[in-house]
Curated annotation (Swiss-Prot):
Name of the protein described by the UniProt record: Uncharacterized protein Mb1934c
Biased composition (Low complexity): 70-88
InterPro entries: Macro_dom, Macro_dom-like
Gene3D superfamilies according to UniProt: Leucine Aminopeptidase, subunit E, domain 1 (3.40.220.10)
Stretches for region Disordered: 70-93
Superkingdom of the source species: Bacteria
Pfam family, one: Macro
PROSITE patterns: MACRO (PS51154)
Annotated organism of origin: Mycobacterium bovis (strain ATCC BAA-935 / AF2122/97)
Residue ranges of every copy of the Macro domain listed in the record: 178-353
Length: 358
């Protein structure tokens, strides 16, 4: 590729594709997971690049992925709706696609929520030289920011199957550095929702919705105390009492996490409120940064013994995470129980994404 010709610097994979005679813009024929996708119809930023770099694909390359390729969408349509426009595939449609033999799962993806003023939408093409792709080169990432506006942020995407996977365990934080927004040094936090047993999560820290006296007698608090062993309750007793909305840490005992952050969401046996839940979430995030944590599991504060409405708690907690300016923290997992809780937190994250795009 010649820089003098004014073309963007492509990644090494895209360069090999060009050398082999393939096209990085014409349906991503050289990439088995992307064959047959009309990328330009769903990713304007990628279309803007591929329009100037596309060349006819070599005859040998499309055959590599012919057996696994999804049929290309017609011009101006999306496979999810078949109608004109850029409507996102529904979750049900994505799961149906994953169940079909021979269908590539990269078409059905979910965008993880991210903090900040803007997060990108669904991007099913995912080629290496797409500025919305997590594999995009820094040069093309800069180009993508200029195409999408000054508040462009790159969000990681994951397959629909992985997003909806019901699991009692999850991996710890990856060693990658945090992404930053153009024009500042504010890090993003990945937001995830999992139906999971918080006591089994292999993260840097998990949270406990506690009372001000740190007596872990019921609900999630009791489960954490049992899993952590007697040392956890002993440390809690030494640090009690704490004020409403405050947070303190203890070791995690026999659990795989390093710390348990206890956030006081109510008095012993008493109700809670939206202000307390917001303050407790913010205090938990600050404590995680103080401890140098990169990954954190949050439980639904105040929705058990506290009796606070689930949808309201999800909205308040997600909002508090979005407003937080992290130090070391890169990943927040909402560990919930039941489909209703998963829907509530997923909807709160999606609502934040929609608001950020407006």
């Amino acid at each position: 590729m010649s820089r003098a010709a004014g073309l963007p610097r492509l990644s090494w994979f895209a360069g090999l594709t060009w050398f082999a005679g393939g096209s990085t813009g014409a349906g991503c024929a050289a990439h088995p997971a992307l064959a047959g996708l009309t990328a330009g119809a769903r990713c304007p930023a990628y279309a803007a690049i591929s329009a100037s770099t596309a060349r006819p694909a070599a005859t040998a390359l499309p055959a590599v992925a012919a057996s696994t390729a999804r049929p290309a969408a017609t011009a101006g349509t999306t496979p999810a709706t078949g109608a004109s426009g850029s409507a996102r595939p529904t979750d049900a449609a994505g799961m149906a696609d994953l169940a079909r033999p021979g269908v590539v799962a990269t078409h059905a993806v979910r965008t993880l929520g991210t903090t900040g003023s803007r997060a990108i939408g669904l991007c099913p093409c995912q080629p290496l030289d797409c500025p919305r792709s997590p594999q995009a080169t820094p040069n093309l990432g800069s180009m993508g920011r200029s195409l999408d506006g000054p508040q462009w942020r790159r969000a990681r995407v994951r397959l629909c199957g992985r997003w909806w996977r019901r699991s009692n365990t999850t991996r710890g934080a990856s060693p990658r550095p945090p992404s930053t927004c153009r024009g500042d040094n504010v890090s993003m936090i990945e937001l995830e929702v999992h139906q999971a047993d918080v006591t089994k999560l292999e993260l840097d820290a998990i949270t406990n919705a506690a009372n001000t006296r740190l007596r872990h007698a019921g609900g999630v608090a009791a489960a954490i105390a049992r899993a952590g062993g007697p040392e956890l309750q002993r440390e809690s007793t030494e640090k009690a009492p704490i004020g409403l909305g405050e947070a303190v840490e203890t070791t995690a005992g026999d659990m795989p996490a390093r710390y348990v952050i206890h956030a006081a969401t109510m008095e012993l046996g008493g109700p809670t409120s939206g202000e307390i839940i917001t303050a407790a979430t913010a205090a938990t995030l600050r404590k995680a940064d103080e401890l140098g944590c990169r990954s954190l599991a949050l439980v639904a504060f105040g929705t058990g013994v506290g009796g606070f409405p689930l949808d309201d708690a999800a909205r308040l907690m997600v909002g508090a995470v979005r407003r937080h300016r992290p130090g070391s923290l890169q990943r927040v997992v909402f560990a919930v129980h039941g489909d209703a809780a998963e829907r509530a937190f997923s909807a709160a994250i999606q609502a934040g994404e929609d608001t950020a795009r407006r």
